[in-house]
Curated annotation (Swiss-Prot):
One of its GO terms (cellular component) is cytosolic large ribosomal subunit. SUPFAM superfamilies: Ribosomal protein L6 (SSF56053). This protein binds to the 23S rRNA, and is important in its secondary structure. It is located near the subunit interface in the base of the L7/L12 stalk, and near the tRNA binding site of the peptidyltransferase center. Part of the 50S ribosomal subunit. Transmembrane segments: none annotated. Belongs to the universal ribosomal protein uL6 family. The gene is rplF. This is Large ribosomal subunit protein uL6. GO terms for molecular function: rRNA binding; structural constituent of ribosome. The keyword RNA-binding applies. HAMAP family: Ribosomal_uL6_B. Pfam families: Ribosomal_L6.
Length: 177
């Protein structure tokens, strides 16, 4: 039995929730997010709270209810406060710039990299070696950050590459003669 699913999600003021069958839509100051809920989960909306319970006949109903609760809680946080992800560029000549919804990266290749940002995601560069991604959808923020990191992952000898701001890169010792 899921302990996560037993805790209700509190809906703050200024957030509008629409439940239409198995499709839930949450709207706030940062936009609107929509998700389809698994048929094994029953969601009730009352008193500015979302409560979750499994439906009969599904073996993994409590597990899916806990997962659904965590996803919808992330949606509520996203439309109220939003999510941020910070990336750092470590290496000589590694630079980033943002023009509109395109991130321009110079990562030591013979060509610059232009990465198109999806709708709902904004990026800014406080310095040439930092990228800050902002948006309401936690999953898309993480995917964009992973895509940018995949262009030049941190290598284990000098640590050069694109890394998350909170990432610790374990460096290896160079080969001895």
């Amino acid at each position: 039995m899921s302990r996560v699913a037993k805790a209700p999600v509190v809906i703050p003021a200024g957030v509008e929730v629409k439940l239409n069958g198995q499709v839930i839509s949450i709207k706030g100051k940062n936009g609107e997010l929509t998700r389809t809920i698994h048929e094994a989960v029953d969601v009730q909306h009352a008193d500015n709270q979302l409560s979750f319970a499994p439906r009969e006949g599904h073996a993994n109903g409590w597990a899916l209810a806990g997962t659904t609760r965590a996803l919808l809680n992330g949606m509520v946080i996203g439309v109220t406060d939003g999510f941020t992800k910070k990336l750092q560029l470590v290496g000589v000549g590694y630079r980033a710039a943002v023009k509109g919804n395109v991130v321009n990266l110079s990562l030591g290749f013979s060509h610059p990299i232009d990465h198109q940002l999806p709708a709902g995601i904004t990026a800014e560069c406080p310095s040439q070696t930092e990228i800050v991604l902002k948006g309401a959808d936690k999953q898309i923020i993480g995917q964009v950050a992973a895509d940018l990191r995949a262009y030049r992952r941190p290598e284990p000898y000098k640590g050069k590459g694109v890394r998350y701001a909170d990432e610790v890169v374990r460096t290896k010792e160079a080969k001895k003669k």
